[in-house]
């Protein structure tokens, strides 16, 4: 097994090479996508072993996150091809100033260098992160969780073949083979080798990285996403949005976890919500505050339920007196990911979008749209819930920093 230290040395060495052209990167992405599809059988075999080992240790919903199919692998390859079609951010001049002495000052996008990604049980993150890192001019160091390691290893093997097939150093994409906490800690403290660290996973992983990292770290959020049903809401629309935001894929970070309902419509709306979530497949367990349990027969919610990312068919429900109370609740319990208001009142919509301090704020739409693909970014590196550098879905532009390039003809000061 290659040590983490050796992988980081190789990655840093590659990051210092002459940059690849846009044409080289796009051709390589196409080759990697082709290689990924060609390796479908090997990837599925590795994934089947991962799934078998994980059964009984993680929930069925998380098993779905872990499981790959030929269709999902094809979607991963298609995602790489979409990244190839996107504009190359490297070398983009975002600001240009002509000094009175003739100097030309250009603010120019450049790669970070080595980007490390620590993630858990989602094999598709492997190809998404590799594609975005590569197109944005970075070298990636991937550290998968143990549940998905076999799948990640097979995926990286295919991607490396795609690189070597077009004569590009395979060490642009690297996978840490040690899935222990020690390897994660090594990445967090690899000053001089890791230029940017991005954790993708649960609250524990993200907290560990933000608290212990000595390298620059972007906090990608857990998703305690709220949907507020205003007193003026179209109730059928609200039901459809809540159904989608909770049941379409509950294990992802943009799924809704909390529903806030205005008191004026609670007696009419809550029975409708209860009936909707108790019909069809994948019924949703509702946990309600004291006002909710007086109207519908659901489990009483604890205070902790409003601070829980369930990642399952469970939702906490609370009645609020007014929109201001809804916003106050969100401010207290949100992870600053995605929130939505269902309303027909423009003043309420404007107040909500202004007052709620999250990365994505919706009006009359599902929180499930907070996604790089849906936002036109191709795939995504993660959803940043911080305010510095990047916020919301992180695409190619967010994987570049900038430098000032100053051109003169002999000026001195």
What is the meaning of each model-derived region?
Residues 1-105:
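N-terminal Rossmann-like NAD(P)+-binding subdomain of aldehyde/semialdehyde dehydrogenases
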Residues 2, 120-140, 158, 162, ...:
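ALDH superfamily catalytic-core signature
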Residues 13-20, 260-261, 312-321, 336-341:
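Short, well-ordered beta-strand elements within core beta-sheets of diverse protein domains
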Residues 20-26, 90, 166-173, 249-255, ...:
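Flexible, glycine/charged-enriched surface loops at secondary-structure junctions
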Residues 27, 323, 328-413:
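C-terminal core of ALDH-fold dehydrogenases
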Residues 85, 94-232, 236:
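Rossmann-like NAD(P) dinucleotide-binding subdomain of oxidoreductase/dehydrogenase enzymes
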């Amino acid at each position: 097994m290659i040590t983490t230290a050796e992988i980081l040395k190789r990655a840093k060495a590659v990051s210092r090479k002459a940059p690849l052209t846009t044409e080289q990167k796009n051709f390589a992405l196409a080759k990697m996508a082709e290689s990924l599809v060609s390796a479908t059988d090997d990837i599925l075999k590795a994934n089947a072993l991962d799934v078998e080992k994980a059964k009984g240790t993680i929930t069925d919903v998380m098993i779905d996150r872990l499981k790959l199919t030929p269709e999902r692998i094809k979607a991963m390859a298609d995602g790489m091809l979409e990244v190839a079609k996107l504009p190359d951010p490297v070398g983009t001049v975002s600001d240009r100033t002509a000094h009175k002495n003739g100097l030309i000052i250009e603010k120019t996008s450049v790669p970070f260098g080595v980007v490390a990604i620590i993630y858990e049980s989602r094999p598709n993150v492997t190809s998404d992160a590799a594609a975005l890192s590569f197109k944005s001019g970075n070298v990636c160091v991937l550290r998968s969780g143990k549940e998905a390691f076999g799948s990640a290893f097979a995926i990286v093997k295919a991607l490396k073949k795609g690189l070597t097939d077009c004569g590009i150093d395979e060490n642009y994409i690297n996978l840490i083979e040690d899935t222990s906490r020690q390897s994660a800690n090594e990445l967090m403290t690899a000053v001089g080798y890791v230029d940017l660290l991005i954790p993708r996973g649960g609250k524990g992983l993200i907290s560990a990285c933000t608290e212990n990292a000595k390298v620059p770290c972007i906090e990608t959020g857990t998703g305690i996403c709220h949907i507020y049903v205003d007193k003026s809401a179209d109730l059928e629309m609200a039901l459809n949005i809540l159904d989608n935001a909770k049941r379409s894929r509950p294990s992802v970070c943009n799924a809704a976890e909390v529903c806030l309902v205005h008191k004026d419509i609670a007696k009419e709306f809550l029975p409708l919500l209860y009936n909707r979530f108790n019909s069809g497949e994948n019924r949703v367990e509702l946990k309600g505050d004291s006002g909710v349990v007086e109207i519908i027969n659901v489990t009483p919610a604890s205070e902790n339920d409003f601070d829980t990312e369930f990642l399952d068919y469970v939702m906490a429900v609370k009645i609020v007196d007014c929109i201001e109370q809804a916003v106050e609740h969100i401010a207290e319990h949100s992870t600053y990911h995605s929130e939505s208001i269902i309303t027909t009142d423009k003043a309420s919509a404007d107040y909500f979008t202004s007052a709620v301090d999250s990365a994505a704020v919706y009006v009359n739409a599902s929180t499930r749209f907070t996604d790089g693909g849906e936002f036109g970014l191709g795939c995504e590196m993660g959803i940043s819930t911080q305010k510095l550098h990047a916020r919301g879905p992180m695409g190619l532009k967010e994987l570049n920093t900038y430098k000032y390039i100053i051109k003169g003809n002999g000026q001195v000061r």
